[in-house]
Amino acid sequence: PVSWYVATTGNDGNSGTLDSPLKSISKALLRVNPGDTIFLREGAYHEFVTPTRSGEKGKLITLKSYPGETAKIDGTGMTIKGWFSALVQLKSVQYMTFENLHICNATNSDVNTDPEGVYINGVSRDITFRNCKVYNIKSTCLAGHNNGDWRSAHAFLVIGDDNGTPIRNLTIEKCEIYDMHTGTSETLTIAGNVDGFTIQDCEVHDVENIGIIVAGGDNLNAGGNISVNYARNGVVRRNKVYRCSHQVSKDFWEGVYNNPAAYGAIGIYVCGGASTIIEQNIVWECDRAIGLVSESNVLATKDCIVRNNFVYNNYRTGIYLGDYIGYTVGGTSGCYVVNNTLYHNNLVGGALNGSNNSENINDEKDSEGEIRLAENCTNNTIMNNLIYAVTDRDIFVRKYTRSGSKNKIGYNLYYSPTSANHKWFWDGVEYTNFSSWQKASGDENSLYNVDPKLVSLDIFA
């Protein structure tokens, strides 16, 4: 293996050694072979990083900052046009690792332009981003949704767009992603034919919409074969996800997008994806915390596990299952919500005012519930969760309609020091009596009004 060196003071005619570094990352990428490492010296590199060579199994190509220094792949002054012109573009690249880099400053205000930090597609596999920071990736477009061209950007955009071979073995770990204006898009997107991924030990925060999404049937890969056009077999683990909220750019959401409620962003979201484990995450101050929801009329969100997460101080619901009411019919099926702690969510009322949905539901005066089941929830299990309601408007569990079937609920602990929110909804009917709730929902072996004796509430202040 060979070590290559790049420095902002280098020369592309140099040999690429430590004493004679190259100037551009692109030149180093043309020389690199499987097993080689490219070290970037301190400084900002204003270029698109587009590898054309791949590593091999056991012989990764690595691009990283020189030890003790910070290299930035920096879009300042660069032209960002259209979609998929990311600062780092991995098109069918394999066996490559990026470490200790900053990927930053890709912005544009034009319509139909999607600034991106990292774009991965094709038959890419065994790609790792480790200890990287991705920030200031922004669309400042002021076109609203009704104009047809609207605000969009991504920190990571991963699209499995090959119908035959999925993207495999993608890892994003120990990265920090923040300061994003993504409009109606998401911060970290895994979509299309992706089979096997891990997002772990990251921080995603201070972004104006969804934090992490695992998606299927998405318009980003509109031509995909529906049998494989969904991300699956992934793990989202030990991440800290916070302030993923329309409140980050309230002027856009309330003014341009005309959404006066402005509380629609989900921290961690599976939307038409499948077989994904969401575990040991901490999610706070998002509009909604964790969603197993489908915006698809074809693909359900299915066979996912949400376990051992800590969800608190979110504006609306803590954990959300089902469709958007009156909007889609894909639903949520075969999912498990177990061993989670939910505390003090629903700081504001719900989004439904009685006239903006086909079921004439109104939840804006109370709330969506710590756990929310909207439409078309089938064969899901909700067990062994600690549900601690605090605000006067809060609700332990809210199932909105009679749609769906065979959902199992039990072995939960429900507690609130405020008697006003000792309530549940099942099939749209409100219950304030625990026995009546159990009879209606089939809830078995849960505990009610037993103080869980949390060690400290200081974290919630």
PLM features: what roles do these ranges have?
Residues 1-7:
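Boundary/junction segments of secreted and surface-exposed precursor proteins
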Residues 8-46, 437:
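Acidic Gly/Asp/Thr-rich repetitive segments characteristic of extracellular carbohydrate-active
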Residues 13, 36, 148, 345, ...:
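Acidic, glycine- and Ser/Thr-rich low-complexity intrinsically disordered tracts
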Residues 26, 30-37, 46-62, 72-99, ...:
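Extracellular beta-strand-rich solenoid/capping regions of secreted or surface-exposed proteins
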Residues 45-51, 75-86, 107-116, 138-154, ...:
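Short glycine/acidic-rich loop motifs that flank beta-strands on beta-rich extracellular proteins
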Residues 60, 66-69, 94-105, 125-140, ...:
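Right-handed parallel beta-helix
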